[in-house]
From Swiss-Prot:
Disulfide bonds: none annotated. The lineage of its organism: Archaea, Methanobacteriati, Methanobacteriota, Stenosarchaea group, Halobacteria. Pfam families: DUF555. HAMAP family: UPF0212. This is UPF0212 protein rrnAC0441. Belongs to the UPF0212 family.
Length: 123
């Protein structure tokens, strides 16, 4: 089975004054580290947090003392996994290897369609 695994990462950015700068730096640094590990197939986006008062989503970023904590969402397709749990372990191992010392948490796993070549091979 094929799965899309979405993970949340907590990215620390130092010496920033602005939320938008912190988000840009976090996405850029994460993308750079993934590309250096030849993992350009991992999607990197800023996460969203729901407002406790109105429920409206806003960017997951917070600045205190010129240091930002940015919540990133990392998505990776995992092919030929035996189960959703197996897909989670594969994704966490792959991404965790490239992003050492970055806290990761699996937030969702979706089963995806097999592409046409795989569907024909299984038939």
């Amino acid at each position: 089975m094929n799965y899309l695994v979405a993970m949340e990462a907590a990215w620390l950015v130092r010496d920033v004054d602005d939320i938008d700068d912190a988000i840009g730096v976090a996405v850029s640094e994460a993308g750079k580290r993934l590309n250096e590990a030849e993992m350009d197939y991992v999607e990197v986006e800023v996460g969203a947090t729901g407002c406790p008062a109105c429920g409206e989503p806003f960017d997951s970023a917070f600045i205190a003392a010129d240091t930002a904590l940015v919540g990133l969402v990392l998505e990776m397709d995992v092919f030929n996994a035996e189960s959703p749990e197996h897909a989670q372990r594969i994704a966490k191992s792959e991404i965790g290897g490239a992003l050492r010392d970055v806290p990761l948490k699996v937030v969702e796993v979706f089963e995806t369609e097999a592409d046409e070549d795989e569907a024909e091979a299984e038939a």
